[in-house]
Amino acid sequence: MMRIALFLLTNLAVMLVFGLVLSLTGIQSSSVQGLMIMAGLFGFGGSFVSLLMSKWMALRSVGGEVIEQPRNETENWLLETVRRQSQQAGIAMPQVAIYHAPDINAFATGARRNASLVAVSTGLLQSMSRDEAEAVIAHEISHVANGDMVTMTLIQGIVNTFVIFISRLIAQAAAGFLGNRDGEGEGNGNPMIYFGVSMVLELVFGILASIITMWFSRHREFYADAGSAKLVGREKMIAALQRLKTSYEPQEAGNMMAFCINGKSKSFSELFMSHPPLDKRIEALRSGQYLK
């Protein structure tokens, strides 16, 4: 329910800003400039709101609990490991959280490198050795140090903008042509055709655009693996990835998969996977391709 409310509020805010910009500039909403402004606001608006609220939304979606004071030896080890690795990586100490899940997983999120969150599953803490767990944590610390959350938000915003702009531009042309041919719309096109065509095109272009964002996501995973290898050693990271082969299928929400150590393996095609296959990640570490 909260996500629906945030979605509606975000879209309402975008529409208000859109109307204000058009009012101040005198640009027509149906013009190319108007479409570009609308596409940019909608394309980046949702992405940046999600980024700014990412820590809160992530904790809420998995039921994670931030460790304020360690209650046992495991929590103390986890905090000290994150503190040591964040110092090595040159970033501020992230918040650390644990969430209950049987799968071996962890994720990092946050709007800034120095205001981030690292969360690990109970399955990881129970199933991995300390060396393997250190490697997974270092992978997430590397995501933060590399600024991957902001990078992926920018990429998603750009892709969203192009999808919306191109879809609406083609829909506007189609509505004008078909509406005027039928003698409807009084020169402005048929609104039913416009919305129908734009919805279909946004769906189709959105699927194609996801190939681009997923490629970037897989690319960042290789660099996060390499970052972990630099922090704790290549063999520890390889051992952690080999351990992931025995894990349950991840249960985290789809919007969190991009920054989990373990992505979903069941996909129509590798093109739509947020993570490379584990064997490819292991091979990349062994070859040192991303360690240069």
Curated annotation (Swiss-Prot):
Residues annotated as binding Zn(2+): 139, 143, 221
Bilayer topology term: Multi-pass membrane protein
Transmembrane regions listed in the UniProt entry: 4-24, 34-54, 158-178, 192-212
Its EC number(s): 3.4.24.-
GO biological process per UniProt: proteolysis
Cofactor(s) this protein requires: Zn(2+)
Domain of life (superkingdom): Bacteria
Molecular-function annotations in GO: metalloendopeptidase activity; zinc ion binding
Record Gene3D superfamilies: Metalloproteases ('zincins'), catalytic domain (3.30.2010.10)
NCBIfam families reported for this sequence: PRK05457.1 (NF003965)
Protein name, per record: Protease HtpX
This protein's encoding gene: htpX
